Amino acid sequence: MKPTEIKKPYRMEEFLRPQMFQEVAQMVHFQWRRNPVDNSMVNASMVPFCLSAFLNVLFFGCNGWDIIGHFWLGHPANQNPPVLSITIYFSIRGLMLYLKRKEIVEFVNDLDRECPRDLVSQLDMQMDETYRNFWQRYRFIRIYSHLGGPMFCVVPLALFLLTHEGKDTPVAQHEQLLGGWLPCGVRKDPNFYLLVWSFDLMCTTCGVSFFVTFDNLFNVMQGHLVMHLGHLARQFSAIDPRQSLTDEKRFFVDLRLLVQRQQLLNGLCRKYNDIFKVAFLVSNFVGAGSLCFYLFMLSETSDVLIIAQYILPTLVLVGFTFEICLRGTQLEKASEGLESSLRSQEWYLGSRRYRKFYLLWTQYCQRTQQLGAFGLIQVNMVHFTEIMQLAYRLFTFLKSH
């Protein structure tokens, strides 16, 4: 359904659609289906997770063995630090998706239950705007992944086909897609180049699919929470305290429903943060390290093809780190909007009972919902500047040594 063609109510599945490359590669880690018994959302298959686990164990097992051999036995290192760091970054997010898969399915069902089923109520909640934002972002990710991804994968292949000097010459690191180490020297053997490149392509597709799935779930969940908080804030603004003087019993019945909904949304915000907090803590700092390596690589080369290959993941790291921090700020502001709506009321015109309740309610609303990780970080724009500063410090350290 296009955002300009509002003909029927939106369904949760429309926000959770995978990208085309994920479907072609059979890397849709959450295959959302409706349970015919209770109409709940379920993940129909675990096969993509199993395939991804096999690829990750093989890739990191081989590279881990090579790293151990380098530090303990003094063997030459075969790693490509920028690529290895971003594969770790993607795989951490994939591991989080697997470990939190039950919580993710449960949370999606929580959001699905809160979404109204009729179009009029959805428009009142401004779900059309939420879907429009999702659709614009989905198209951007589709263009970027289906153009930038193939370019990143094809550049090493083109370098090998155009510049490799012969079958007796080992494959150089810049001619490999991911680099690293594989048994029996097959990674550096030109006779096995296409086989190794195909394996790297599968690992790359797996990692990008992890990243896209994580990104879409994070943003869809955040968009729905902001939508619900905004709708509740408008309901707060519509409260007329003077009605507590005419029909106090009915007034407090309606008020109780609003407070219960606020408590429900606060609980959903906490569950949302619990799902992603470990990924925030680990992957953001790994992302800073990855960004440092990419900046170092770009500053040390003058090859146009290599610059073109590595500029894309650099922009991805900066852009998506910025967006995650921006989403945290947006959620915090949406939560603060509840308190702002209350403070704009003419509460002093209400009954004595309401005035007492209003003071307690205002104190409760001051507890804004924030994204963070174990009290160590707060995911907002300040955190984005901290990550960029950390990446710059690491970059200057590498340049000085």
Curated annotation (Swiss-Prot):
The residues on the Extracellular side of the membrane are 48-52, 164-191, 299-303, 392-401
- Which keywords fit this entry according to its UniProt record? Cell membrane, Membrane, Olfaction, Receptor, Sensory transduction, Transducer, Transmembrane, Transmembrane helix
**A Pfam family name for this chain?**
7tm_6
InterPro entries linked to this entry? 7tm6_olfct_rcpt (IPR004117)
What's the chief localization of this chain? membrane
Lipid bilayer topology:
Multi-pass membrane protein
What ranges are annotated Cytoplasmic (topological domains)? 1-26, 74-142, 213-277, 325-370
GO BP annotations, alphabetical order:
detection of chemical stimulus involved in sensory perception of smell; signal transduction
Could you tell me where this protein is found in the cell?
Cell membrane
Q: Which GO terms describe its molecular function?
A: ionotropic olfactory receptor activity; odorant binding; olfactory receptor activity
Q: Does the keyword Cell division apply?
A: no
Tissue pattern of expression reads: Expressed in olfactory sensory neurons in the antenna.
* Remarks, miscellaneous: The atypical heteromeric and topological design of the odorant receptors appears to be an insect-specific solution for odor recognition, making the OR/Orco complex an attractive target for the development of highly selective insect repellents to disrupt olfactory-mediated host-seeking behaviors of insect disease vectors. Odor-evoked OR currents are independent of known G-protein-coupled second messenger pathways.
Q: Of which family is this protein a member?
A: Belongs to the insect chemoreceptor superfamily. Heteromeric odorant receptor channel (TC 1.A.69) family. Or49a subfamily.
UniProt function note: Odorant receptor which mediates acceptance or avoidance behavior, depending on its substrates. The odorant receptor repertoire encodes a large collection of odor stimuli that vary widely in identity, intensity, and duration. May form a complex with Orco to form odorant-sensing units, providing sensitive and prolonged odorant signaling and calcium permeability.
Subunit-level organization: Interacts with Orco. Complexes exist early in the endomembrane system in olfactory sensory neurons (OSNs), coupling these complexes to the conserved ciliary trafficking pathway.
- Write down what this protein is called: Odorant receptor 88a
* Species, as recorded: Drosophila melanogaster (Fruit fly)
Q: What is the lineage of its organism?
A: Eukaryota, Metazoa, Ecdysozoa, Arthropoda, Hexapoda
Q: Which gene encodes it?
A: Or88a
